[in-house]
Amino acid sequence: MSKLTIPAGYKTPLSTYEMQRAIEFIKSNFQVNLGQALNLRRVSAPLFVEENSGLNDNLNGVERPVSFDIPDVGATGQVVHSLAKWKRLALKRYDFKPGKGLFTDMNAIRRDEEVDNLHSVYVDQWDWEKVIERQDRNEQFLRQTVRAIVGAVAETNDALQIAFPSLHTVLDREVYFVTTQELEDRWPDYTPKERENAICREHHTVFLMQIGDDLKRSGKPHDGRAPDYDDWSLNGDIIMYNPVLDSAFEISSMGIRVDEASMDYQLHKRGCDDRRELPFHKMLLSGQLPLTIG
């Protein structure tokens, strides 16, 4: 059942027609701002991948991808959940060099998504990935990238309000960095979502770090993360305070991606050792894929 909520007395400041114009404006402006901030080039994205390639995003490990047979090639296609792993392989195939990356306007179907104000069965999102050096696999580089993304979002918002004066969204460019363990230590009796809401009410733009591994108090992860793309020690969510919903509003789930060692640990930790035999995972564990952030 949908958990959609509409605050009492809420009215959108734009007509349906204006809303479509604003969406077009955001998309055209943000892709330029993001590309310049992170040195990215736009590429085309697949709608589906081959089932046994290991390229689809397993999300939390329980979501069922939309699948269909392709008789002419004797394979099964899966509509993507995200392009987290496909992008890394694309960077290798397209021969991107360190410091450069790609972005794409991704469409996906997540049939088992819990639908609410922020989540839909249909996904339309920017997906990006960038080649890095091994020495870039650190928290300082992660924070630097987060600040660049927040800057691109804020610049898009500034331009949007000039084009559509009835919009008055205020975004805080100052990012507050905090780990999931620090939130659990501060609010041990809160649910993960309640912790996110609480910290966003205090600091309106937050990067919540280290999502996926088990927390010390509860023994459970703050939120689910697949073991084969993000390095759980070097990832996080950019979340902003949404005054209309009075809640945290996730705008980006991102991170420095697994290398050979962190993927080995995370696959074993989550009981996913069977994935080691998939083509993507074999390439990564043998060092054939570039190190990336995305």
Residue ranges and their predicted role:
Residues 2-119, 127-131:
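Class II aminoacyl-tRNA synthetase-like tRNA-binding/catalytic domains
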Residues 18-21, 25, 29, 137-144, ...:
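Generic recognition of stable, solvent-exposed alpha-helical segments in well-folded globular domains
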Residues 31-42, 147-158, 212, 216:
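Hydrophobic/aromatic-lined pockets within catalytic cores
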Residues 47-51, 165-172, 211:
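A glycine-rich phosphate-binding loop feature that marks nucleotide/adenosyl-phosphate handling sites
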Residues 66, 101, 107, 116-121, ...:
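Flexible, active-site-adjacent loop/turn segments at secondary-structure boundaries
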Residues 99, 104-197:
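Extended, charged alpha-beta segments that form solvent-exposed binding/catalytic grooves
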Residues 179-294:
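A translation/RNA-centric and nucleic-acid-associated enzymatic feature enriched
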